[in-house]
Design a protein with these regions (language model features):
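A short, Lys/Arg-rich alpha-helix, primarily the initiator
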Residues: 1-14
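Residues that mark the N-terminal boundary/hinge immediately upstream of a DNA-recognition element
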Residues: 6, 17, 42-45
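Key DNA-contacting residues within the recognition helix of helix-turn-helix
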Residues: 8, 33-34, 47
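Residues within the alpha-helical elements of helix-turn-helix
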Residues: 13, 24, 52
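Short alpha-helical "recognition helix" segments of helix-turn-helix
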Residues: 20-22
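Recognition helix of helix-turn-helix/homeodomain-like DNA-binding domains
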Residues: 26-41
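Short, charged recognition helix plus adjacent turn
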Residues: 34, 58-75
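Short, basic-rich loop-to-helix N-cap that marks the start of a DNA-contacting helix
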Residues: 38-51
Length: 75
């Protein structure tokens, strides 16, 4: 999945809308909308949005399998 698709999936699972996510990270709804439309998003912005939903970015060896409830970002 693309990074923005992962964020959208987590938002859906948690019932968090764009406005609520924006409030959590201190940006306007339009900024969240624009970020989620991008194919590429900076690691900093990705981490910021994930942290607001109690997720974190972890780097592991590529040979390690993705477990249930984990995501793998495609480039």
């Amino acid at each position: 999945m693309k990074a923005t698709e992962i964020v959208k999936d987590i938002m859906e699972k948690q019932g968090v809308g764009q406005t609520a996510l924006g409030k959590r990270i201190g940006v306007k709804n339009d900024a969240i909308y624009q970020r989620l439309r991008q194919d590429n998003i900076s690691v900093e912005r990705l981490m910021q949005m994930l942290a607001a939903m109690d997720y974190k970015l972890v780097i592991v060896p590529a040979s390690k399998p993705v477990r249930e409830n984990e995501y793998e970002v495609e480039v």
